[in-house]
């Protein structure tokens, strides 16, 4: 695919400015942009910067559905879309939203994939061919007759993508399509997008916070802030040369580019190095150094989890699950004699492939599900007879979809709602609500309607509502969906402080980097069973077992494993900070070097002889 061969823009945006109803702040401000046919564009930026608003202009959802004040023009192949209707653009611009449930209409997977083509009046045989093709492309073959409500979040997301692909649009917009997918599922979807772009020349616009997964496969990167496009260029150039600006926006560079930059890659005319090249640079750097390293030489991990407060002897575990059995409504087995023990004050990451049973297991702790047999104890007390309302005083649960637990007319009212139901005095309610809003950086939006917030901001609002209730056990079910890295880390840093005060945290996530950085213990589920359970470093040192569960260790852990296979004496590493600290202690000269000078360190061994770098 060579987008440069097609010089005429497929899409042109001219001076687009837009305000949502009842909002004085512009969601988009004087945006000018051209896209060529066949481009694969990554659209990045902090939560609430206008990314989703911008792409919704392409099929007239903004302002046709959203209302508000709109000025400027959107042209598709030179045609002004000002007077076009949303439905008339469905064949030209497909859109996959952050929340797949907003665009799933049918009972089964196959019926939903057929929904669009049926509305086009296509012959039955053509519809069947399209559905069969899409089922294979999005990895849902075998699930065609499954009811939508029985699917995991990731399976629903792939169904939504498939429904768009069945329409065969020229432009496909994907608003965080991998947010609910495990690493294996993310890889499958991104490979699919890569194939569509390369083989069909489908123009792709991808909004994504998972930069590690996508930066190498896109042609172009756009960065937005406060309703404007502020950066536009090749991904690796922006990620390396504008790192300081990106960090200020809460956009952290991919682990790969951060490590490569630290090792001296990305000079003026360099390109993205391969993983093997990165590994070779590390090998030669470490072989050239014979400095003896002591544990005390390593800098303290920035991500180090505070040790839980010591527990008195004979204190029961905070959570004890014994012989838990549960079946779904369709009769399929979720768990069979599952056992799990969680100590008070632990920070536990619950990982696993889509459909492994993570959310179903966590839902038992708040009373959303009732086991067929077995029992669950909180602080030594059997909760089988407890209502969800009673459990909510002890257990705070954040859903994957924040809209499932937001229903008032203002941000402040939302945080106060649970407190009012507990009958607290008004003064205490206000104090707790203000504190929770400040913690989640939402004080400035206290009078705004929740649905005028971005998805990431609504996610933080749901968390604020939970934190105001001060539960002892926090269950965070994919809390990072729709948020930029800066907000994610600020949020999890605050959760970690609560954990340090003794609160137990269960983090359900597909983000291996965050699990490695924040959790002290990792539990991996596979097909309704506990597959791996242990300290984070130990679990992430088992790549084969993780791969069998559809997971992949974070990059520093993989590098450390491969270096040990090459005979390098290196400890288990989990984060980029771990790797940098180790390298600085092992190779003190790195601390004083600029990134582009580091390659000179490995050019000579002890005898002064040159060694081959690549």
Swiss-Prot record:
Alphabetical UniProt keywords: ATP-binding, Cell membrane, Membrane, Nucleotide-binding, Repeat, Translocase, Transport
UniProt superkingdom:
Archaea
What EC number(s) is this enzyme filed under?
7.-.-.-
- Residues reported to bind ATP 2: 352-359
GO cellular component labels? ATP-binding cassette (ABC) transporter complex
* Subcellular localization: Cell membrane
- One Pfam annotation reads ABC_tran
Family listed: Belongs to the ABC transporter superfamily.
Q: What is this protein called?
A: Putative ABC transporter ATP-binding protein MA_1747
Q: What is the lineage of its organism?
A: Archaea, Methanobacteriati, Methanobacteriota, Stenosarchaea group, Methanomicrobia
């Amino acid at each position: 695919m060579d987008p440069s061969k097609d010089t005429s823009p497929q899409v042109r945006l001219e001076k687009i400015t837009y305000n949502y109803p009842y909002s004085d702040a512009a969601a988009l401000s004087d945006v000018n942009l051209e896209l060529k046919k066949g481009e694969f564009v990554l659209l990045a930026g902090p939560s609430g910067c206008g990314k989703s608003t911008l792409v919704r202009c392409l099929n007239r959802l903004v302002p046709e559905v959203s209302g508000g004040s709109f000025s400027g023009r959107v042209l598709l192949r030179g045609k002004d879309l000002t007077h076009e209707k949303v439905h008339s653009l469905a064949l030209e611009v497909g859109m996959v939203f952050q929340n797949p449930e907003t665009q799933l209409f049918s009972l089964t997977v196959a019926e939903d994939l057929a929904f669009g083509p049926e509305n086009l009046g296509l012959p039955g045989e053509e519809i069947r061919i399209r559905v069969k093709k899409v089922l294979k492309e999005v990895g849902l073959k075998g699930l065609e007759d499954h009811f939508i409500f029985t699917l995991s979040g990731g399976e629903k997301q792939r169904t939504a993508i498939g429904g768009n692909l069945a329409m065969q649009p020229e432009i496909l917009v994907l608003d965080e399509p991998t947010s609910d997918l495990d690493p294996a599922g993310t890889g499958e979807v991104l490979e699919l997008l890569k194939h569509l772009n390369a083989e069909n020349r489908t123009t792709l616009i991808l909004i994504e916070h998972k930069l590690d997964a996508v930066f190498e496969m896109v042609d172009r990167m756009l960065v937005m802030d406060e309703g404007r496009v502020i950066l536009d260029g090749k991904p690796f150039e922006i990620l390396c040369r504008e790192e300081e600006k990106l960090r200020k926006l809460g956009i952290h560079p991919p682990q790969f580019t951060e490590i490569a930059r630290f090792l001296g890659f990305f000079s003026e005319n360099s390109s993205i190095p391969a993983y093997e090249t990165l590994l070779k640079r590390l090998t030669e750097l470490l072989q050239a150094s014979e400095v003896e390293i002591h544990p005390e030489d390593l800098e303290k991990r920035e991500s180090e989890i505070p040790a839980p407060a010591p527990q008195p002897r004979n204190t029961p575990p905070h959570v004890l699950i014994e012989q838990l059995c549960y079946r779904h409504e369709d009769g399929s087995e979720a768990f069979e004699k599952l056992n799990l023990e969680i100590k008070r004050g632990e920070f536990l990451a619950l990982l696993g492939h889509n459909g492994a049973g993570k959310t179903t297991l966590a839902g038992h702790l708040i009373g959303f599900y009732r086991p067929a047999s077995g029992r669950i104890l909180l602080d030594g007390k059997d909760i089988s007879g407890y209502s969800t309302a009673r459990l909510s005083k002890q257990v705070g649960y954040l859903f994957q979809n924040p809209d499932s637990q937001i229903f008032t007319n203002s941000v402040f009212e939302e945080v106060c709602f649970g407190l009012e139901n507990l009958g607290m005095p008004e003064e205490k309610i206000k104090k707790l609500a203000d504190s929770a809003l400040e913690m989640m950086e939402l004080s400035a939006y206290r009078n705004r309607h929740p649905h005028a917030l971005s998805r990431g901001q609504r996610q933080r609002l749901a968390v604020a509502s939970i934190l105001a209730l001060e539960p002892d056990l926090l269950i965070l079910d994919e809390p990072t969906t729709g948020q930029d890295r800066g907000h994610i880390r600020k949020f999890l840093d605050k959760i970690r402080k609560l954990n340090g005060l003794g609160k137990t945290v269960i983090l359900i996530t597909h983000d291996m980097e965050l699990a490695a950085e924040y959790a002290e213990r990792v539990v991996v589920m596979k097909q309704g069973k506990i597959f791996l359970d242990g300290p984070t470093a130990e679990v992430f040192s088992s790549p084969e077992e993780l791969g069998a569960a559809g997971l992949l260790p974070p990059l520093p852990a993989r590098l450390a494993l491969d270096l040990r296979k090459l005979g390098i004496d290196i400890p288990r590493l989990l984060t980029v900070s771990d790797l940098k600290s180790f390298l600085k202690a092992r190779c003190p000269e790195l601390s004083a070097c600029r990134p582009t000078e580091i390659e000179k360190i490995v050019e000579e061994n002890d005898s002064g002889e040159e060694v081959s770098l690549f």
